[in-house]
A protein has these predicted regions:
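Cytoplasmic helix-loop-helix junction between adjacent transmembrane helices
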Residues: 108-146
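Helix-loop-helix hairpin linking two adjacent transmembrane segments in secondary transporters
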Residues: 104, 133-134, 138-187, 236
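C-terminal transmembrane helical hairpin of 12-TM major facilitator-type secondary transporters
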Residues: 276-320
Length: 400
């Protein structure tokens, strides 16, 4: 292990917050088109389905890049890597703000994909290096809380800016946020040297880790099922639930608040009953994406299903990462990079599949198919015996 448990003088929690702010910023950038899809489509004359590539493209490149980061970085200080990726994040959002065509916006989003893969591949494994062992669970919730916090403040703020000043200003605002995050990171994050480089053998050694492989499968199903529907949440709320455009921002804010609550609730629950926590998350997601298009034909019911959706999805990232840490305690960066790769591949596949379904069959059919994917994840969790997981963990992972 490349441990660096900071003492009190190293400001471990401020450093952890800086890493969490980095994840918040990159997730805000990644999810921004979700709240801006309608004005982007209008400005650049594209179909909703094609514009969905603004979500799937960066996710696809993040999936490809995440494992390559930990392989290629070798012994490079992780602090230096984070600084470099934040600089790239600033450039990607400036390019997006200046884009005059969908093709140029796609290029900016591909550049963002490299930032996502790089930042998450590193950030996911930093909790145990920045804080004492007893505080790792809380540090994970802070770092992965950036996902839910981006839904609360990032995406709704993007919607407000997009409505008031145009969607380009939303991307410009994220570039400014990335610059401020970079300054904080330079001030509070300690050097994070690596004494043992990760090799290709480190990855191939995990082929026999059944618990890790199951976690990766669950990651793909839960995230793909979510993003099949969530990529089109704005048109879903407006056309199915009959919610006016001016209320979409506040509703997404409420969705994000529910997500933050779900993140910390799931973080605590997963520490005690991980499998059961993930099963409840899968059930909540399935109910939300199935029932919103089928029964959410009024603003009140549509909003209620959206809040359920937020609570359930808020617990996804922290619970799945907890699964990875338990599955491969002696290969944290390997497990983290594989997790991020599958997570973003699932975003790409889910949003791409959702775009195809929406363009050909409509929003309701897309919601039903999304729910079926999530129910498959639930079925796998129900059929997987806890005893089998415990046995697999002992057999596949060396003692931590």
């Amino acid at each position: 292990m490349n441990a660096l448990h900071a003492d009190g003088g190293a400001k471990p929690w401020l450093a952890t917050f800086a890493v969490g702010l980095s994840t918040f910023t990159v997730v805000t950038a990644e999810m921004l088109p979700v709240g801006l899809l309608t004005p982007i489509v209008s400005t650049l004359n594209a179909s909703i389905g094609r514009a969905g590539l603004l979500i799937s493209l960066p996710a696809l490149f993040a999936a490809l890049f995440a494992p390559l980061v930990v392989l290629g970085a070798r012994r490079t200080d992780r602090r230096s890597l984070l600084v470099g990726f934040l600089l790239l994040l600033i450039a990607a959002n400036l390019l997006a703000a200046a884009a005059t065509s969908l093709a140029l916006l796609f290029a900016a989003r591909i550049l963002l994909g490299f930032c996502i893969g790089g930042i998450w591949a590193i950030a996911g494994g930093l909790a145990e290096r920045l804080v004492p062992p007893a505080s790792v669970g809380l540090a994970l919730s802070v770092i992965f809380g950036g996902v839910a916090a981006a839904s609360v403040f990032g995406v709704p703020l993007g919607v407000f800016l997009g409505e008031a000043l145009g969607w380009r200003m939303a991307f410009l605002a994220v570039a400014v946020l990335a610059a401020l995050t970079l300054l904080l990171l330079l001030c509070v994050l300690p050097s994070l040297p690596v004494t043992q480089a990760i090799s290709w053998r480190s990855f191939t050694a995990q082929r026999a880790n059944r618990r890790l492989l199951l976690g990766l499968l669950l990651t793909f199903l839960l995230v793909a099922g979510h993003f099949m529907a969530y990529t089109f949440v704005r048109p879903l709320l407006q056309t199915v639930a009959g919610i006016e455009g001016r209320w979409v921002g506040p509703l997404l804010f409420a969705y994000g608040v529910a997500g933050i609550a779900g993140n910390f609730i799931a973080g605590q629950a997963a520490a005690k009953r991980l499998r059961r926590t993930l099963a409840l998350i899968a059930l909540g997601l399935a109910l939300a994406v199935l029932l919103l298009p089928l029964l959410g034909h009024a603003p009140l019911s549509g909003s209620a299903f959206l809040l359920l959706w937020g609570i359930a999805y808020g617990g996804v990232s922290v619970s799945l990462m907890a699964w990875m840490l338990k599955a491969a305690p002696d290969a944290v960066e390997v497990a983290s990079s594989l997790y991020i790769a599958l997570f973003n591949l699932a975003i790409s596949c889910g949003s791409l599949a959702g775009g195809l379904v929406v363009d050909t069959g409509g929003l309701t059919i897309n919601g039903v198919l999304s729910g079926m994917v999530l129910l498959l994840a639930l079925a796998i969790l129900i059929r997987t015996r806890p005893q089998a997981l415990a046995t697999a963990a002992k057999a596949d992972s060396p003692p931590g």
